[in-house]
């Protein structure tokens, strides 16, 4: 097999593995507005790009505050 074909085959296999991992991780996350109790012994993560809000303990969109 030529080197180019081997590289393509490796990239295809790697992308399939990453996709499988991403869908498995995404299946364990909770959506926007769902309760995300920070004190739970088995915490569940909010789906990307959500974060668990400190004041509401629900999944909210992540924000970045930049001070001028």
Swiss-Prot record:
Membrane-spanning intervals of the chain: none
Protein location: Secreted
Notes on the domains: The presence of a 'disulfide through disulfide knot' structurally defines this protein as a knottin.
Entry comment describing in which tissues the protein is expressed: Expressed by the venom gland.
Function: Binds reversibly and blocks P/Q-type voltage-gated calcium channels (Cav).
Disulfide bonds: 29-47, 36-52, 46-59
Major place of residence: secreted
Signal sequence residues: 1-22
Keyword Transit peptide recorded: no
Name assigned to this protein: U-reduvitoxin-Pr3a
Keywords: Calcium channel impairing toxin, Disulfide bond, Ion channel impairing toxin, Knottin, Neurotoxin, Secreted, Signal, Toxin, Voltage-gated calcium channel impairing toxin
UniProt keyword Membrane present: no
Gene Ontology CC, one term: extracellular region
UniProt lineage: Eukaryota, Metazoa, Ecdysozoa, Arthropoda, Hexapoda
Protein family: Belongs to the venom Ptu1-like knottin family.
Gene Ontology terms for molecular function: calcium channel regulator activity; toxin activity
């Amino acid at each position: 097999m030529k080197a180019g074909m081997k590289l393509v085959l490796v990239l295809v296999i790697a992308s399939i593995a990453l996709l499988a991992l991403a869908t498995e991780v995404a299946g364990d996350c909770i959506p926007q507005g769902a309760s995300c109790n920070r004190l739970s012994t088995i915490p569940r993560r909010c789906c990307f790009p959500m974060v668990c809000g400190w004041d509401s303990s629900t999944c909210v969109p992540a924000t970045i505050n930049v001070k001028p």
